[in-house]
């Protein structure tokens, strides 16, 4: 009798647990994308030993630790690729790697990097600064915020370090707008974008940097240099206050800015992460160099995601990488009982389209699943992937080849403990759109 009672009790308990999970699950309120998605996670037999096989290959940037993440990259004038990342999840000493062969292999990075980089508290972002006087050499700039991590104290503000010799040497970090300044901020992901500005239709030596804070206020600050070449940043100001209701509902953050006409035009497009995941990424436009922005609209499902990074390709198209966030019916059908938040991720995704697609609200041409990012104890590629990926370093080589780097769990056999936790590494992939165009066309002709 006691045995029967125990069985019934256990059955009731199990039912209660699963019923509770089902009741707590948020609904999938988004839509599905309808453009093709090219899956480069597994090499099909028909492309083995062909000119397309490279599209399915990954190069290891760094797998020397159990967890490395959040890379950013810049193309050097000699064709080398410099990639930077923190030694940890979102923070830690800045580490670097350099590829001298177009992303095929990665070797040692910067020698004798600044000692202040050891105390970096966030994901570093790196940009090239092209001056307009025809005399001043390009600078490279690394920026790293000082956010608040849990109970750890922070002085806030953001740090920047400058190189005027193509990354061989760097200044020590200089901090701007910490808690002791007249305009204190505690930024997150500074700068998620850095855009050279125009005045009277011509580029000037001013750059607009964007970041957000823990309350999802979004800020801009303008970078200039004094006559001695020292960086100055204007006092951060909120640039989206006019749309505070939707900014807050979306938990808008990690904004990428894209300039029209292959980076030469007069219109700016903003695309953001919606951290609430209860609405899609937001898109907004500015025709006055970021002084004002149009009413934000939700991006098409094909572009919905987090930490968008955009580059123009040699043929004028846009290649935008991001962490996929899927909120539609297909996502709901593929979700497991553990996916209770109204979304799932396909992992590391790239979108191929045009600036006009962004303006017109089109879905674009196609998406690319660049590799499968495994969940712990997931043994083979699946529609649902690990969402801990998608912060990318993207460069376009002179021959048009795209080299994109991200982080994630790429190998289901690379376990770091007995319970099946997988190693998180940084890898890169080479992409040529003329080749992915062919594969997508083959998909359409052979559904």
Regions from the language model: what does each represent?
Residues 1-7:
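Positively charged n-region of N-terminal signal peptides that target proteins for export
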Residues 9-16:
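Bacterial N-terminal signal peptides
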Residues 17-28:
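Sec-dependent signal peptide cleavage junction
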Residues 26-447:
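Asp-box/BNR beta-propeller blade signature and adjacent active/binding-site loops
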